[in-house]
Amino acid sequence: AEPLASQLKEPIAGGGWWAA
């Protein structure tokens, strides 16, 4: 849940693209 690739695998844990 750090790089973009991790956010694609675990977006909830990364709180990344979908939350933006």
UniProtKB/Swiss-Prot annotation:
Q: Which UniProt keywords apply?
A: Glycoprotein, Protease inhibitor, Serine protease inhibitor
Q: How does activity depend on temperature?
A: Optimum temperature is 4-65 degrees Celsius. Activity decreases rapidly at higher temperatures, nearly 40% of activity is retained at 100 degrees Celsius.
Look up the domain of life of the source.
Eukaryota
The keyword Glycoprotein appears for this protein: yes
How activity varies with pH is as follows: Optimum pH is 4.5-9.0. High activity is also seen over the range pH 2.0-4.5. Activity decreases with increasing pH above pH 9.0.
Where expressed (tissues)? Stored in epidermis and secreted into the hemolymph and cuticle. Not detected in the interior of the epidermis, fat body cells or columnar or goblet cells of the midgut epithelium (at protein level).
Keyword Cell division listed: no
**GO MF term set:** serine-type endopeptidase inhibitor activity
Post-translational modification summary for this protein = Glycosylated.
Quaternary structure (record): Monomer.
Q: What does this protein do?
A: Inhibits trypsin and chymotrypsin.
Q: What is this protein called?
A: Protease inhibitor
